[in-house]
Amino acid sequence: FAEHCPDVDILGINVYGGAPVIPAQLLEQGYDGPYVMTEYGPLGYWEVDHTPWGAEIEQTPDQKAAFYKRSHLESVTAAPDRCLGGYVFKWGHKQERTDTWFSMLLPGGERTPSADVMVELWTGEPVANQAPVVTDIRTDLKLARVDAGVPFDAAVVVSDAESDALSVEWDVRPEGTDKGAGGAFEATPESLGHLVESADGLSAVVRTPSEPGAYRLKVYVRDGNGGVGAWNVPFFVNDP
């Protein structure tokens, strides 16, 4: 890089899974000049495992928050004499493969654990009331091929630092088919919330859709204080 681009004043880098190794990689390429992390965040959907039918498997909120923190510490603050700063993606809401993949905030401004961890890194102080942290959805639907019209139990595994009273919203949506490239707009799949037959506390009963194809079971856990934990698991409804 340094051989072919000797006159670079400042280098801007968009990187996700590889963010923690950027300082070392730049030196290996012969570049010891200033750089800016112009995009970093969770693992990209091009960097994760897929289901057999091609659905990308999203990191859990706790995994995302940990990776935002690691990327910041190892690519931004680890090289203060070279890194001029960075921009996390995305301080806002965006449908890109899912509505939560890169969204650090939900449409109403609710903070995810990823937002909370970045606030603490930037200010040195934790947020006053931390968002719920979802670590799993326990269900036989997860990553499974299933028949149409069958009820399944589901339960979200979540913790809340302040032991707030939590409200839980379940949803089912088709896998997005409007898959853009380079951050292009993607339409949000229509909710099939009527398939949530019952919900009680952290648990729900969900009936699989009647139409074959790829879907996601989604959960949003809110603490009533501006925080939310949200995740999803893919599943596939078989042909009759």
Regions flagged by a language model, labelled:
Residues 234-240:
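Short beta-strand edge segments in extracellular beta-sheet folds
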